[in-house]
Amino acid sequence: MPKKDGHTHTQFSHHGTTEPLSAYLSHAVSQGFSDYTVTEHAPLPGAFLAQFTGPVDARDHSAMHEDELAQYCQLVDQLQDEFQSQLTIHRGFEVDFLVGFEQDTRQFLDKMADWTDEIVISVHFMPNKAGQLAPIDYTPEVLAAAFPEIVTAPQAVFARYFDTVQQSLDFAKTLSHPTKIRIGHLTLIRKYQKYFELPVFNHENLLKITTILNDMKSAGCELDFNSAGLRKPYNGEPYPTASIARQAVQLGIPLVYGSDAHQVADQGQDYDILENILNQPLDN
């Protein structure tokens, strides 16, 4: 695994610290990273925000605002020049896949194609039984309110999540510009596994994961190997889990470490742990 942090955030996330991007980059240099992708949450579509029925804070503080986009791009460009002798900086976004808003997302990516080197496509919101796009990683209480089956039938929620991830991958395969694409934190649905005492994935969901991985391989997508779950009190595992990560390696899918840092201290966290996971046999 290259010494690269491929999933990072900035002061524009609105749910992290206000530390400047330059501090993240200096920290990465001090940790021996050679490559760094800035992937702030892309602005969410206005039509999605207008119909969102979840917590106001989740609506307003999940992503960069549209009127900050130019400032974000200018800052990344400036620091790319300033750090060029110390760190290869790639310009990017973490893009939410939102069912029903694919055209809005496509228009944004087309508009930003000339500027963008890499994107992480992630599922943070998925449709519930009422058809509402609800956040899955905001709080355990919000997850349970939108998806009460997480308590009574968790495998059904897992299946709904992986179906949505599959849709995000199908969408990614339709993008025509040569931007490098990673699928973000593949097992984020387990963020609150200790809170809900979630079971391991059943056979049906493991098959869905295998299908996703095979499709990623065919499409030439990378996989975000995300350390954030190790820092979450109700999780304790990376995204994806160790066995899924090793399965991806066996299939020849490139894994890229992602700290998912929203504060400087988290940049580079647990890189060695994730690297060691990939050095273990597949069946461990």
Where on the chain are the PLM-derived regions?
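An N-terminally biased module of ancient metal coordination in phosphate/nucleic-acid-related enzymes
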Residues: 1-99, 103-107, 194-203, 243, ...
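Extended recognition/assembly regions associated with phosphoester-bond processing machinery
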Residues: 2, 13-14, 18-21, 27-29, ...
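Divalent metal-coordination and catalytic microenvironments
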Residues: 7, 28, 119, 185, ...
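Glycine/Thr-rich phosphate-binding loops of Rossmann-like dinucleotide-binding domains
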Residues: 46, 129, 233
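Extended substrate/RNA-proximal surfaces in nucleic-acid metabolism proteins
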Residues: 62-215
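Active-site-adjacent C-terminal substructures of enzyme catalytic domains
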Residues: 205, 209-261, 267
